[in-house]
């Protein structure tokens, strides 16, 4: 299974990077990252804390509005914490650029970005993932947590959504 191989690679990098010097805060960006984050955490050997944040920039479309809104904020203080942001896809970079700055202003000691999918061709903000699973082309992908209008998240694989589905 290609995802299992990805987990092994990401976890070995993560586990090596963080070793056992501290307990990082794994911070999932809802809703898209929840499946990836759960699988990553189940396979990890790291002792870590868990937190979630929900943001919105897509509403029901396929193109980011460019305006990031926090819809569910952090429930704990992150001052001095090493944050590992777990994201489903790094696309335009608007969301992760916003979040990385937001966490630093909240007092995070460091922010590391781990993403399942990376779409560098769409980047509009100067942000790069510290760890990325797969680079994907400029197509709208769904499944394994990724959605279109809140649909397709539960697919056990990642697929390209046909344009006729979202062009209506």
Give residue ranges: language-model regions.
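PRPP-associated nucleotide enzymes
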Residues: 1-168
């Amino acid at each position: 299974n290609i995802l299992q191989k990805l987990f092994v690679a990401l976890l070995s990098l993560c586990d090596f990077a963080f070793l056992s010097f501290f307990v990082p805060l794994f911070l999932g960006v809802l809703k898209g990252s929840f499946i990836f984050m759960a699988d990553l955490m189940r396979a990890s050997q790291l002792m870590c804390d868990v937190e979630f944040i929900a943001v919105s920039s897509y509403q029901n479309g396929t193109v980011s509005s460019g305006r990031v809104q926090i819809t569910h904020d952090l429930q704990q203080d992150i001052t001095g914490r090493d944050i590992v942001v777990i994201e489903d896809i790094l696309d335009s970079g608007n969301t992760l650029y916003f979040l990385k700055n937001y966490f630093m202003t909240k007092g995070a000691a460091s922010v590391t970005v781990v993403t399942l999918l990376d779409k560098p061709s769409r980047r509009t903000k100067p942000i790069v993932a510290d760890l990325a699973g797969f680079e994907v082309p400029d197509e709208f992908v769904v499944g394994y947590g990724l959605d279109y209008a809140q649909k397709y998240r539960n697919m056990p694989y990642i697929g390209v959504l046909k344009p006729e589905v979202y062009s209506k």
